[in-house]
């Protein structure tokens, strides 16, 4: 491919939106084609690059995907579950590929994403970081070797503004561990503990959540036995790691057929 893939960023003025715009500015194979904000925003008409602090990129923020449908190839969405579903429906109508980094979807929404992906290409991942996706592969190995004989705990920490808990990344960690052990996460997960809980059931997977300050994202899976424990940890110090992963996903997705993909496939890990 000789031409750059044009991406649209929805939620352009948000924390992640601005980082996505910055990431697009510094990509060799990606260019920013459109930036979208909610109707009524005072930022409509502003230059997206100026908003993100990377200088003028000659892309004005608009309030409707309809107005820029011919200006981009792939939509990138890190907004909210309800907003993402509306954007997905728009992409379905206009046959646009979509990268979804939003977390907090319910079961019905996930089913709808899968259904839409039968007609358009979709990358859907709770975490676009290359490091996190490598961690997920390491979890499979650790679980296969020692998961049956250890107490497994997942600890995650994020900034005080994050709305969903546990994080989508933590839940994905739990799903990988449970699937490797042949268990159902819905049946074996324990979310927090309080009071007199009794002895720990080794067949459970515990989750602990921290919300504090400006923590970008930290995730640890602990495999604890008598006398030793293994901890697999990923710490993000900047949202740029997620944004760069999303750009990589958008470039990869542009040439794909309709289907539901994840970052493991984008990175060639599965």
Curated annotation (Swiss-Prot):
* Reactions it catalyzes: (S)-2,3,4,5-tetrahydrodipicolinate + NAD(+) + H2O = (2S,4S)-4-hydroxy-2,3,4,5-tetrahydrodipicolinate + NADH + H(+); (S)-2,3,4,5-tetrahydrodipicolinate + NADP(+) + H2O = (2S,4S)-4-hydroxy-2,3,4,5-tetrahydrodipicolinate + NADPH + H(+)
The GO biological-process annotations, alphabetized, read as: diaminopimelate biosynthetic process; lysine biosynthetic process via diaminopimelate
Q: Where does NAD(+) bind?
A: 11-16, 37, 101-103, 125-128
* Active site per the UniProt annotation: 158 (proton donor/acceptor), 162 (proton donor)
Q: Which InterPro entries match?
A: DapB_C, DapB_N, DapB_N_CS, DHDPR_bac, NAD(P)-bd_dom_sf
Protein role: Catalyzes the conversion of 4-hydroxy-tetrahydrodipicolinate (HTPA) to tetrahydrodipicolinate.
Q: Which pathway is it part of?
A: Amino-acid biosynthesis; L-lysine biosynthesis via DAP pathway; (S)-tetrahydrodipicolinate from L-aspartate: step 4/4
GO MF annotation terms: 4-hydroxy-tetrahydrodipicolinate reductase; NAD binding; NADP binding; oxidoreductase activity, acting on CH or CH2 groups, NAD or NADP as acceptor
Q: Which domain of life is it from?
A: Bacteria
Where does the UniProt annotation locate this protein? Cytoplasm
What EC designation does it have?
1.17.1.8
Quote the protein name from its UniProt record.
4-hydroxy-tetrahydrodipicolinate reductase
Subcellular location, principal: cytoplasm
Family, per entry: Belongs to the DapB family.
Cross-referenced Gene3D superfamilies, in alphabetical order? Dihydrodipicolinate Reductase, domain 2 (3.30.360.10), NAD(P)-binding Rossmann-like Domain (3.40.50.720)
Q: Provide an example Pfam family for this protein.
A: DapB_N
Q: Which UniProt keywords apply?
A: Amino-acid biosynthesis, Cytoplasm, Diaminopimelate biosynthesis, Lysine biosynthesis, NAD, NADP, Oxidoreductase
Keyword check for Nucleotidyltransferase, yes or no: no
Q: Which residues bind (S)-2,3,4,5-tetrahydrodipicolinate?
A: 159, 168-169
UniProt xrefs under CDD domains: DHDPR_N (cd02274)
């Amino acid at each position: 491919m000789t031409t750059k893939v044009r991406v649209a960023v929805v939620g352009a003025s948000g924390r992640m939106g601005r980082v996505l715009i910055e990431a697009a500015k510094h990509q060799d194979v990606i260019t920013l084609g459109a930036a979208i904000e909610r109707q009524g925003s005072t930022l409509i008409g502003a230059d997206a690059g100026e908003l993100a602090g990377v200088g003028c990129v000659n892309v004005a923020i608009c309030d409707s995907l309809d107005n820029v449908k011919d200006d981009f190839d792939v939509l990138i969405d890190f907004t909210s579950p309800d907003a993402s579903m509306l954007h997905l429906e728009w992409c379905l109508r206009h046959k646009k590929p979509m990268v979804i980094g939003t977390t907090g979807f319910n079961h019905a929404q996930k089913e709808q994403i899968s259904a839409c992906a039968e007609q358009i290409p979709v990358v859907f991942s709770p975490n676009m970081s290359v490091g996190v996706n490598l961690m997920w592969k390491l979890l499979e190995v650790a679980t296969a070797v020692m998961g049956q004989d250890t107490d497994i705990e997942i600890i995650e920490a994020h900034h005080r503004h994050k709305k969903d808990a546990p994080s989508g990344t933590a839940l994905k960690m739990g799903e990988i561990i449970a699937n490797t052990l042949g268990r159902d996460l819905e049946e074996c997960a324990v979310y927090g503990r309080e009071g007199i809980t009794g002895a720990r059931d080794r067949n459970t997977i515990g989750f602990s959540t921290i919300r504090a300050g400006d923590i970008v994202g930290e995730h640890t899976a602990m495999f604890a036995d008598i006398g030793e424990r293994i901890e697999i940890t990923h710490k993000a110090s900047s949202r740029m790691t997620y944004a760069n992963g999303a750009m990589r996903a958008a470039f990869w997705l542009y040439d794909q057929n309709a289907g539901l993909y994840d970052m493991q496939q984008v990175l060639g890990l599965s």
